Structure formats: C-alpha cells, structure tokens
Regions:
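Conserved beta-strand-loop-beta-strand hairpin that lines the nucleotide-binding pocket
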Residues: 1-17, 61-145
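Short hydrophobic/aromatic-rich motifs at helix boundaries and adjacent loops
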Residues: 3-6, 24-30, 41, 75-76
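STAS-typified acidic loop motif
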Residues: 15-27
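Conserved short strand/loop->alpha-helix "switch" segment adjacent to the catalytic nucleotide/phosphoryl-transfer site
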Residues: 26-54
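Short, solvent-exposed helix-to-loop capping segments enriched in aromatics
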Residues: 55-59
C-alpha cells in the first residue's frame, strides 16, 4: 500500500473513496489495517483502528445514506483517521442498545481523541479519531469538543 509523503511536514497520507455498498466497511477495515501495518503500528493499534474505521463507515452508510471517504495520516507516531460523508446532521454519542449504537461508543472508548467537523453548507461532516501507533488497550472517554 502506498502513501503520500508531505516533504515539508513529514506527514504520511493515504485516502480511499468508498462506495455506498455493503462492502464499504470491509474495504475500510482492510485498507486501514494495511496502512497502519505499513506504518509499523502495534497489533492492537491495527485492530482498534480497523474496527473504529469500519464502524464510522457503517455509520455513514446507515445514517447518512451516503458514500464515504476514508483518509488516514500519520505523524509523530500518531494516526489520524477521518471518515467523511454527505449526510445531514451530526452523529450523537449514546449508550449502545440491542439494535446498535456501538460505532461512536467504541470510538469514544478506544481512540486517544475524536471529534466531528461539520462541512460547509447543510450537509456533510467528517468524523475523526486519533490513535497511537504504539498504543495498547485503553478505555476512557476522549471526545474533543
């Protein structure tokens, strides 16, 4: 898997446009895990990163009814993973229930930090999270307002 390198900042970047199909979460998992592995991430970071990316892509498909764009950057041992969609409204962190609600909840528990960037206009947003490449298991709320 190849990544771009910003020569000025040393940030490694890769992105993938995902279709609005049932295969998108699986593609996101494979893409995320592969890139994190190429960057030397710990097994835990690879697993947690692919899980959170998959959940956020699933949220885009289910709630935004939109294709998603997955963007990953790595700098100074930290990966930032973003999922952008064209759906209206912001996601809401809630307690999971029998019918779902695990996406943001898992992200809140596993990520170092996370947040939402509204798009200009009435539709669209980017949900992002950060995770340490050398990270290990951690369970704490990390929402950045």
């Amino acid at each position: 898997m190849s990544a771009g390198l910003d020569q000025e900042t040393g940030v490694r970047i890769t992105a993938r446009q995902l279709g609005a199909s049932r295969q998108a979460p699986a593609v996101a998992r494979q893409f995320t895990r592969g890139f994190l592995a190429d960057m030397g991430a710990s097994t835990w970071c690879q697993q947690a990163g692919e899980l959170m990316a998959s959940e956020l892509v699933t949220n885009a498909l289910v709630h935004a009814e939109s294709a998603a764009r997955l963007w990953i950057s790595v700098a100074d041992g930290i990966a930032r993973i973003e999922v952008t969609d064209d759906g209206p409204g912001d996601p809401v962190l809630r307690d999971p229930g029998p019918a779902g609600g695990y996406g943001l909840w898992l992200t809140d528990m596993l990520a170092q930090s996370w947040g939402v960037i509204p798009a200009a206009g009435d539709r669209g947003k980017t949900v992002w999270f950060t995770i340490s490449l050398s990270g290990s298991r951690q369970f704490t709320s990390r929402l950045v307002s």
